[in-house]
Amino acid sequence: MIKASDFGPDFLWGVATAAPQIEGAADLYGKGTSIWDSFTNRKGKIKNNHKLGVACDFYHRYQEDIALVKLLGFQIFRFSISWPRILPLGRGEVNQEGIRFYHHLINECLTQGITPYVTLYHWDLPQALEDEGGWTSFSINAAFNAFVSICALEYGDKVKNWIILNEPFGYTSLGYMLGIHAPGKTGLSNFFPAVLHTALAQAEGGKILRAEISQANIGTTYSCSEIIPYTQSENDLLAAKRVDSLMNRLFIEPALGLGFPTADWDLLEKFQIEYGTWRLNDRMKFDFDFIGLQNYFPLTVKFNAFIPVIQAWEVKAKSRKKPHTAMGWEINANSFYNIVKQFAAYPNVKNIMITENGAAYHDKLIEGSVVDAERIEYFELYLAALLKAKNEGINISGYMAWTLMDNFEWAEGFNARFGLVHTDFKTLKRTIKYSGYWWQEFLRN
């Protein structure tokens, strides 16, 4: 049985959240409309037509929730600053009530001995900017840079740990190519410009923080999945390379000064030629202090000529009779180890933090308790895999569990429960699950 002490005395343990998923107060206290506010109001976009609305009401209950972070024994609380809460129209006039809220939240963390890790963009783009094209518009970069600068000047004396973007592949692919997340756009004509402007934003945001906050610890996060070919046929191997270049390499390689990974996917080569991205390589490069990795599942893929764009198809865990979570995501701790090793192999990756990792299950509150033994087993498996990678010499400085409490899980609405704490979405009562108590004991020892 692994122990927290096995990771060493300097290893950091935390729990992660995101503003649009927990805050609530979606149209209160001067906050502007976000693309997720708009998207959830479109019928059929979210399971059971759930809307953000109150969410977990973290805005009014943050003291209670920070107390839970402390009670469970975590050192770090990762949260995001809502862009439309600070700048209701995305630029221009600042909402002082929003500014005050995050001052209060940061102060509460510090008072409780919790280190805040602040994410600057966790998918809640102001709708006013989306009306101008959102991430497909070149003007988005100036607006984002101004937002970053405001946050740095307001909070930089109290917050030293910053994350520029959360999972850029997630919001560009799901929101601007497949249309299943906000803002619901589709096609490569939206996806490629969003990719380019996002790659610029992650670097330029880092440069602003570096200039404005002394001793800042600056990172950004990437979703990552080991891509496994279904067979060793040439077609499946090439399909896996294409998917890997898209899902794992698309944003980290520009940040490392390598440009976009065009070698294994001809459409990326065409994108580079059309947009002249090689001319922007220096602007897309930034020397991050840490890279945040967010892993939930591997992806097994096979060649399929009828799938547009990527000519690859996922072979689901269930069809391969592999263990999986309530989301259908394969449980494979060895693939977690493999993908950490893959990212660590880049010469310029100095430090890795696991900024999200967790699992959704069909949790039930029965007689005041949530017995989520499957989630405990999941964490035991994945932490053992992480320790193996760390013991092999990879510089891994911390781990953040996703997530503190059940919340709004994007297109899944309130159906997918990832929390260490159960949320009753009718009463908003919090109940620590067995997995939360497991973490408490793990960190105590």
Question: Which sequence ranges carry the predicted segments?
Answer:
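Catalytic domains of carbohydrate-active enzymes, especially glycoside hydrolases
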Residues: 61-82, 286-290
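Glycine-rich, proline-tolerant flexible connector loops at the mouths of alpha/beta enzymes
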Residues: 81-94
